[in-house]
């Protein structure tokens, strides 16, 4: 019976999340992990591994991706063309220069998605941009000027509950409102 | 000895098996020898998967509860919720918690806030 609950188009509709590296100080891997969860749909109570219930994620300002330590200059990305002797490596800094921060983010997220037939489809829902401009402004839903993100993909994301509470749809208790501490 | 044909004995046995596999795809519902093998395989699958079903659904419920619980607060998780549930001796099982998570998310938040001591 739990498979038939909430089988509505609204529940399975894909939402668009926006994330800007200019305002988010978290390092590359931590953000990539959160992005991968959203691409899989694991932030939803109707999650099912057989259906692709993931969402879209727009990542802007990828040129400002933050990494700790000396990873930027020491982390190597390897490619091999299956021809003997064709192992090539490129440091993360050179990746940024040649392909941009978007590719670095995509490589990170790709490794965090489950390796199955849905991996490429889910990765295609990650839209990366080097600057702040992106053509999907109309897809990101806003209520009263605040982006409706029901989860924490943004750094200090306003939760859906906080937005609904502003509109007096929730009782004014501590129920469900994100606590900044703890 | 006079010659004795087997008659319809084997055919009756095989028809029963053929009825079982009547909805299978391709040769699996048409060819007798294949039908016998596929019936055995399908019964084995259903026997094994009756136990897998219980395991699989519990895993799915846990994933769903985790999804909703983590959306609420920064450092809360399914494991902490279950720990608090057992500490307060609340008898809600994962199936019910998962249904509450789908249908009435605020109710689940209320429960988790109450038992969070």
Curated annotation (Swiss-Prot), chain B:
Q: Where in the cell is it found?
A: Plastid, Chloroplast
**One GO BP annotation here?**
ribosomal large subunit assembly
Q: Name one Pfam family in it.
A: Ribosomal_L20
The answer, when asked if rRNA-binding is one of the entry's keywords, is: yes
Per UniProt, which keywords does this protein have? Chloroplast, Plastid, Ribonucleoprotein, Ribosomal protein, RNA-binding, rRNA-binding
Q: Name one GO cellular component term.
A: chloroplast
- Provide any one GO MF term from the record: rRNA binding
Q: Which PANTHER family match?
A: 39S RIBOSOMAL PROTEIN L20 (PTHR10986)
Q: What does this protein do?
A: Binds directly to 23S ribosomal RNA and is necessary for the in vitro assembly process of the 50S ribosomal subunit. It is not involved in the protein synthesizing functions of that subunit.
- Indicate the family of this protein: Belongs to the bacterial ribosomal protein bL20 family.
Q: What is this protein called?
A: Large ribosomal subunit protein bL20c
**UniProt source species:** Eucalyptus globulus subsp. globulus (Tasmanian blue gum)
């Amino acid at each position: 019976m739990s498979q038939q609950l909430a089988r509505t188009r609204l529940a399975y509709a894909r939402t668009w999340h926006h994330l800007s590296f200019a305002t988010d100080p978290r390092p590359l891997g931590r953000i990539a992990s959160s992005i991968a969860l959203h691409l899989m749909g694991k932030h939803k109570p109707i999650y099912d591994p057989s259906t692709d219930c993931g969402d879209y994620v727009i990542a802007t300002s990828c040129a400002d991706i933050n990494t700790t330590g000396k990873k930027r200059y020491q982390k190597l990305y390897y490619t091999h063309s299956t021809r003997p002797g064709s192992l090539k490596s490129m440091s993360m800094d050179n990746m940024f220069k040649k392909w941009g921060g978007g590719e670095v983010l995509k490589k990170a997220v790709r490794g965090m998605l489950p390796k199955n037939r849905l991996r490429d489809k889910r990765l295609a829902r990650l839209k990366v941009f080097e600057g702040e401009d992106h053509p999907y402004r109309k897809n990101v839903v806003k209520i009263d000027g605040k982006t409706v993100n029901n989860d924490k993909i943004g750094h200090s994301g306003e939760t859906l509950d906080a937005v609904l509470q502003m509109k007096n749809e929730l009782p004014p208790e501590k129920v469900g409102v994100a606590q900044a501490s703890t | 000895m006079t010659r004795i044909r087997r008659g319809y004995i084997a055919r009756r046995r095989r028809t029963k098996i053929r009825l079982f596999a009547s909805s299978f795809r391709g040769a699996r519902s048409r060819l007798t020898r294949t039908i016998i093998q596929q019936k055995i395989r399908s019964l084995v699958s259903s026997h094994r998967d009756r136990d897998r079903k219980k395991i699989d659904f519990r895993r799915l419920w846990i994933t769903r509860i985790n999804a909703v619980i983590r959306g609420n607060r920064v450092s809360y998780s399914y494991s902490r919720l279950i720990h608090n549930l057992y500490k307060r001796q609340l008898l809600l099982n994962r199936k019910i918690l998962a249904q509450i998570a789908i249908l009435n998310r605020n109710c689940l938040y209320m429960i988790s806030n109450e038992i969070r001591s």
